[in-house]
């Protein structure tokens, strides 16, 4: 008879050993970001110069107006593009004057609303987002809290490995994030780490790198906090595990489609395309990576002003503008590809300019309002944040 196999006994490591290993992993990650790449220096200076940063190993002809790096040199600017840049410079002068008299304005100011719907100039986008999110007040109220949260994250956050993985793959085609452990990667890691211990019900979310394109580090942290917890944004319900706000928005959008776009709604049903397949990213990320970047910026300008309403209005606007193309697509795969890929590349090959799309967005807003479809049902109980850690 062959000898019996020896029994294997699992030996559990002492809790103190596991904790020590976790502490070491956290410390190593923080040290990587602290010791590599560009040192932080004066963050206000970094923010002021962020639009002019260039990388020595990248042909500047491959970098577009927004800082994204392309494989091939970009074509020479057309006469219209040069004219557009000149117009933006002139607009910036008017916006700068408006910034100086900010205390005299309200969110409902006709001048402010009209100009925001035309798009905030890139050079002043961060300054106006900061004003619309009331970040000066947040920095004053929470003075010193962000540094304390970073220290706490260094000692206790359980999300750091996942955060590091996300930082590694985020916006690597952008001049601010393309070098591993560079300044903006360090800021992104620090903000996500701090937020993971500040709002333990969510941990962290994926819009931070986009905000960092236009805001300095600490302002970005409090911008994230405002967007998640404060009206008219209150995105908390999009990110908690049961996604209550996402489902509420998707249910309401079904009503909008049934009433305002019945042919599109029927067509989608015919090919078993449910709207929740494409609206999940539209609503949770406010169209980030879902539409051309320049158009996304225009939508975010309006989102900073009006909040969550633009999520539904833009969804309706997208389908309304593209309704004829959608109805001519005769398979699930073709419909899904159009909504997930073609819209992101060129808004479905529309002949409309971005200004015209935003004008149509305004029209869609008024139509939803006329049909009592602009306002959603009230928040559900599980959409409210119960605690923040300070």
Where are these regions (language model features)?
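Solenoid-like repeat scaffolds
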Residues: 117, 304-305
């Amino acid at each position: 008879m062959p000898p019996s196999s020896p029994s294997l006994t699992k030996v559990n490591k002492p809790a103190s050993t596991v904790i020590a290993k976790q502490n070491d992993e956290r410390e190593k990650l923080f040290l990587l970001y602290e010791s590599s790449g560009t040192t932080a220096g004066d963050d206000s200076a970094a923010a002021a110069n962020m639009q002019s940063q260039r990388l020595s190993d990248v042909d500047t002809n491959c970098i577009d107006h927004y800082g994204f790096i392309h494989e091939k040199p970009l074509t020479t600017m057309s006469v219209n593009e040069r004219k557009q840049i000149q117009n933006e410079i002139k607009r910036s002068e008017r916006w700068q004057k408006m910034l100086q008299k900010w205390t005299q304005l309200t969110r409902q100011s006709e001048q402010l609303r009209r100009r925001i719907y035309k798009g905030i100039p890139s050079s002043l986008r961060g300054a106006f987002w900061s004003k619309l999110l009331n970040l000066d007040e947040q920095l004053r109220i929470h003075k010193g809290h962000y540094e304390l949260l970073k220290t706490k994250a260094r000692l206790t956050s359980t999300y750091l490995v996942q955060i590091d993985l996300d930082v590694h793959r985020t916006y690597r085609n952008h001049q601010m994030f393309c070098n591993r452990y560079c300044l903006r990667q360090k800021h992104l890691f620090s903000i996500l780490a701090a937020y993971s211990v500040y709002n333990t019900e969510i941990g962290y979310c994926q819009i931070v790198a986009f905000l960092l394109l236009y805001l300095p580090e600490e302002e970005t942290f409090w911008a994230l906090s405002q967007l998640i917890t404060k009206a008219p944004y209150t995105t908390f319900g999009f990110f908690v595990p049961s996604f209550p706000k996402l489902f509420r928005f998707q249910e309401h959008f079904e009503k909008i489609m049934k009433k305002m776009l019945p042919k599109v709604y029927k067509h989608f049903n015919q090919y078993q395309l449910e709207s929740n397949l494409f609206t999940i990213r539209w609503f949770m990320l406010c169209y980030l990576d879902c539409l051309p970047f320049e158009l996304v910026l225009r939508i975010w300008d309006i989102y900073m002003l009006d909040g969550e309403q633009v999520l539904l209005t833009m969804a309706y606007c997208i389908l309304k503008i593209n309704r004829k193309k959608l109805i001519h697509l005769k398979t699930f795969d073709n419909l899904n590809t159009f909504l997930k890929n073609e819209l992101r590349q060129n808004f479905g090959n529309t002949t409309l300019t971005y200004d015209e799309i935003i004008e149509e967005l305004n029209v869609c807003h008024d139509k939803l309002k006329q049909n009592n479809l602009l306002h959603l049902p009230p928040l559900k109980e599980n959409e409210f944040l119960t605690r923040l850690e300070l």
